[in-house]
Amino acid sequence: MTAKGNPLTNHQESLRGFPGFLQDVNQHVDRAIAQGMSTRSFVLQIAERYSYIRLADLYRPLRFLRQLSGQPPVCFGASGFRRDLVDDQEPARHYTAFVFVGYWLPTLLATPILWAWEILGFVRYGWQWSQPDIRSGTIGIRHGRCVRKQGPGVLPTLIARDLSEKVGSGPLDNG
């Protein structure tokens, strides 16, 4: 816990890559199911933990936007994530942000938000386009829609299937 008593602001958690992310999501799913937590509450919890989306800060837009583009409370690193989804050291952050967006909005509305966010990033980061972020965000939106329909229990399977670097998936492989 930090001095303010918020366990979510501990940036000192170890970087454990994809396996750590999947394990942490599994633990949150298990806890949500055991406690009878609503899917809505689960999504809010993981969005705050992995992407620093705190709806309580919406009334302070600059702080809210700084949090979105900053380091999340819990960090895992990029190891073990599909390489075509990684453009920085926190791919779980971007992915989870769009799980959040996909949960709340239909794909037809969520996709323009993804593109708008990436266009803003393109300008902010000196004309550097991130196709990995578009891919990751698209997967996140799709997973968010699935969580909305099927509940938190579906998320670990989707993450394992779609975000993990597969053995033998290098650029020289044929399949």
Task: Identify the residue ranges that each predicted region occupies.
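Intrinsically disordered, low-complexity, mixed-charge
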Residues: M1-G175
